[in-house]
């Protein structure tokens, strides 16, 4: 019963995330943090432009609240909006900008390289961008772009790398955009830090010196 409830909550959060992703395109939507409280459900929305989430005179946030209660059966939803501190270190926002550029007809290589420069310029330890689909012809293919240091497997890849998957709808078909970012403050398991300090001379002690 507990497992079924847990799965149900995860499915619900995923559906809400997808709803916000389509509804808050102009806001530069990143992700949500959903927590249940004794009086209801607190949903924190992280976005590049919080003003678009709130809307004019609070119209948008009111619409979102009503939709969550009616269509997603969220108990007494309370929406809080927070601004993403550095959009160029957020894989969801970076991926969305790449997808939007592709939909406007920008070349995928130019778009990817431009995104990588912004991410690395913001201090990221590493970034990986994968674009897959019908990019310039009838045949589907995958193009990978990377800079810096990146963990691709194991526990470090799960714990230290933030990733997001976005879709771009082009005339030739749907193109997938996967962005992985390793942020500046990440400490790797094999990373060694040498502390600077005063070096003191140690005099060797022995019983002979006492005699």
Swiss-Prot record:
SMART domains xrefs: KH
Pfam families: KH_2, Ribosomal_S3_C
Domain KH type-2: 16-85
InterPro entries reported in the protein's UniProt record: KH_dom, KH_dom-like_a/b, KH_dom_type_2, KH_sf_prok-type, Ribosomal_S3_C_sf, Ribosomal_uS3_arc, Ribosomal_uS3_C, Ribosomal_uS3_CS
Cystine connections: none
Any one GO MF annotation of this record: structural constituent of ribosome
Alphabetic keyword roster: Ribonucleoprotein, Ribosomal protein, RNA-binding, rRNA-binding
Keyword Flavoprotein belongs to the record: no
CDD domains: KH-II_30S_S3_arch
Swiss-Prot/TrEMBL GO biological process terms: translation
GO CC list: cytosolic small ribosomal subunit
Family the UniProt entry places it in: Belongs to the universal ribosomal protein uS3 family.
Assembly description: Part of the 30S ribosomal subunit.
Protein's job: Binds the lower part of the 30S subunit head.
UniProt xrefs under HAMAP family: Ribosomal_uS3_A (MF_01309_A)
Name the UniProt record assigns to this protein: Small ribosomal subunit protein uS3
Organism this protein belongs to: Methanococcus maripaludis (strain C5 / ATCC BAA-1333)
């Amino acid at each position: 019963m507990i497992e079924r409830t847990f799965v149900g909550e995860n499915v619900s959060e995923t559906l809400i995330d997808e709803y916000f992703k389509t509804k808050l395109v102009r806001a530069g939507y990143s992700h949500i943090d959903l927590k249940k409280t004794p009086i209801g459900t607190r949903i924190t929305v992280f976005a590049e432009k919080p003003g678009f989430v709130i809307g004019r005179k609070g119209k948008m946030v009111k619409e979102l609240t009503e939709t969550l209660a009616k269509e997603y059966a969220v108990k007494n939803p309370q929406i809080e909006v927070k601004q993403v501190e550095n959009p160029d270190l957020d894989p969801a926002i970076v991926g969305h900008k790449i997808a939007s550029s592709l939909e406007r007809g920008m070349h995928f290589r130019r778009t990817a390289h431009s995104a990588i420069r912004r991410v690395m310029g913001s201090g990221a330890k590493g970034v990986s961008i994968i674009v897959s689909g019908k990019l310039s012809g009838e045949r589907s293919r995958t193009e990978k772009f990377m800079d810096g240091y990146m963990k691709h497997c194991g526990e470090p890849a799960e714990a230290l790398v933030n990733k997001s998957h976005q879709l771009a709808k082009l005339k030739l078909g749907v193109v997938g955009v996967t962005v992985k970012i390793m942020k500046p403050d990440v400490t790797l398991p094999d990373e060694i830090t040498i502390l600077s300090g005063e070096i003191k001379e140690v005099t060797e002690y022995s019983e002979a010196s006492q005699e």
